[in-house]
C-alpha cells in the first residue's frame, strides 16, 4: 500500500499550516472547563468555521470543505502541531455528526450540522447512567410515547461538556417489553435548557466541571429529534461509539504532536546516562508514527467492523505511556500544574496524565474492547461472562 501523500494532499497540508500559523491564538485560552474559557473556545470554533476549517471533511452544504477522510487526518496533524486549542465542539463534530450522516434524515442534517460546525450549538454526550457505564444496554432512562414525540425521564452521568453545552444526545429505553437489553432503545436529541432538564456539574479534583449529571423529568422531544427508527437506537448508537473509539475523536495527529513535545522535553530534562528513559521516549515516538500510518491505511481501505475497538486500545494506552514517560522525565517537577521557577517546560503533562488515566475506562473499557477484538476480528470463541 502506498502511504505517501499526493501533491494535492501536500498542497492542502501547506494551506492548513499557513492558515493555522496566522490564526492560532498566541496566548493559551482559559480552560474550557470554566465559563470564561468555554466562551473563548466557542469563539475559536467560530473562527475555524469562518474559513471552513471546523469540519473539513463535511460536505460544503453543511459548513465543510468536502475533503476526504485522509485530508482530515492531515489537517488534524497540522492542527495539533500548531498548538491549537482543544475543540469544545468535539462531541457534535466527532460523534453526533457522523451518526447523522449515516442514520439521520436530510432535514436533521440541514438543521443541525451547520449550527454544529459554526459553534452555535455545542453538544454534550448523555450515555452513561449510575448503573450503566460500559454495559450501556442496561440503561434505565426511558422514552414514553406521547402526541408528536416522546417524554424522556431518567438520569445520565459523566456527561462530557454538559455543564456549558447547549444540547445533548443520548439513548433511552422506549420499548420495555423487548426481550434483549439491546433492543427497544431510542436515540434522541434534546436541549439542556428544555423544561424538565436539570444539569448538575461534577467537579474534577481541581473543582472544574469537566462532566455533569443530567436529570430528566418528562422532557418533551419531538419526533424530528429522534435519530433513526424508534426502538432501533442501539444500531444508531454503535455508529457513535465507533467514532468515539476510533480515529474520529482521537486522531493520530494529536499523539504525533505529543510525541514531538516529549522528545523536546527529553532533550532538556533527561539524564544523558538514563538509557531506559531514552528507550521509552523512542518507543512512544515509534508508536505514534505507527498510529499515524494506521490512520492512513484506514482512510484508504475504509472501516472494518470492529477496528474502532482496536484503535481505542492503541490510542488510550499510547496516551498513558506518553504522559507517564513525561512525568518520569520531569521528576518532582511533574507534580506542577503549571510553569514555575526553574522547572523544565511542563507542557501540561500533569493535567494530561490525570485525563489519560481515564482513557482505558471511558468509551468502553479496554477489557471490553479486547473481548470485541478477540471475537469479531480474530474469530475467537466468546469468553465466559460473570
Where are these regions (language model features)?
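Amphipathic, small/basic residue-rich leader segments at the start of a protein or domain
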Residues: 1-88, 111, 115, 249, ...
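Glycine-rich beta->alpha junctions and the first turn(s) of the following alpha-helix
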Residues: 7, 197-291, 359
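C-terminal helix-coil-helix/basic helical segment that borders enzyme active sites and/or dimer interfaces
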Residues: 28-35, 271, 275-278, 289-342
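Internal helix-loop-helix
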Residues: 49-110, 114-119, 161-167, 288, ...
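Glycine-rich phosphate/cofactor-binding loops in nucleotide/flavin-utilizing enzymes
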Residues: 74-75, 95, 236-240, 244, ...
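A short, Trp-centered hydrophobic/proline-enriched beta-strand micro-motif
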Residues: 119-127, 170-171
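A structural signal for short hydrophobic beta-strand segments in well-ordered beta-sheet cores
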Residues: 141-144
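A short core secondary-structure module
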Residues: 153-199
